[in-house]
Amino acid sequence: EGNPHCHVILRGGKLPNYDVANVKICEKELRGAGIIENIMIDCSHGNSEKNHFKQLNVLDDVANQIAEGNNSIIGVMLESNLNEGNQPIPDDLSEIRPGVSITDACISWESTETALRQFAKSISGATSNRNLKSRNGN
């Protein structure tokens, strides 16, 4: 049977794939395969062209898609940490800056909070009656 609450994550690749055209392609492919059209957008990675600041542009675009009536986008992912940026792992671990990623560059907690509050405000009217779609209708 599988997970009735499954979703696809669009994270980009060589090019971003969070835009309206690519979301529609994903919806069509899922529908054609008989899979529920639940899509999550990764605002980082290929969709931000690995520039952590561009995550906010992706998030704004996704908010617009939802506000304009898209019902298949069920969530977003952001790369976030207490402080922005990233750092290499130093030989002397006491030099690690707390709250700064040691992998991909992240937006700061302050930027994250501001962005998510704006995102919620932007989509509030469009999401008040939405439910997560599942294979079994629950």
Identify what each model region corresponds to.
Residues 1-137:
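Expand to "…catalyze enediolate/carbanion chemistry for C-C bond making/breaking, isomerization
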